[in-house]
Each structure stands twice: as C-alpha cells, then as structure tokens.
C-alpha cells in the first residue's frame, strides 16, 4: 500500500478522501491501498490551509507531482529487480513491466526491495503553490417586497447555487 502524508486538515471538506482518491488514480490502485496521515505538525509537510476547493487544486497537484516522481523511482528499482535498464520498463496498472519481455514486478515487490539492501527508498515529496486560489462560481438570488412609502424591505425568498465543477468526492 501507499502512505500519504499531507498537511491539510480535513475539517469536513473531505480532503483526506479526495487526496487518497487522487493518489489511487495516479498510482493505478484501489483507494483501499492508501493510508492518509494528515495534519501532524511533527511529521506532515506544510499546508497553507484547508478551505474551499484550494486543497483539491493545490495539495492535489502536489500529490500528482509526488506520484510522478514515485513512479519514476519505482521504475528504477523495478528495473533492478528485472535485470534491465529503467528505460526498458513502464509503470502499468500498479506494476513495473518490461514490455519487450512481458516480465513484471508488483509495487509490493518494489517496496520490499527499496527497504531491504537498497540505497534508495521508494518515497517521493512534492510541493505545489498557486499565485491565485481557484475561483468559485456562485449566484445568489433574492425575492423582496418593498414598501415604497416607508422604504421597508422584506425578504420573501433567497436561493444560492454554487457550481462545484466536477465533484471528486
């Protein structure tokens, strides 16, 4: 499985689940194979805050970048196990595969190799920042009654609609 250390605090935004889903999609595994460790100031990376959709965009991009690094690292380690060069292998469906020979090793085998008699641990860290926060799209509508003589405004109805885009969680 994969361990995901994040600095975002899940305050009802669902970021733990969203980021685990993003890792699972990038690493081509089940979300059940992802353990999320978040908001531990002794161990977690810095995060500017968990609010609106910014965690999905900003921290999610960092997760994607870390997955890209990890795949390359896993390909290097997997190539050692397969006795070939990293250029000869690909990351496919959670395995390191040599398409020319059809041989493959699992992510679990790569993880074990990285921890036993190896000078390279299978781990990756990435950061991502954005100069602007992604804008939310929202509209609010109000129906009022106006007494033109007194200026009294009475709110009869109010509706707000937020476009969340494509829901991830």
Which role fits each region the language model picked out?
Residues 1-169:
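Cofactor-binding beta-sheet edge motifs in enzyme active sites
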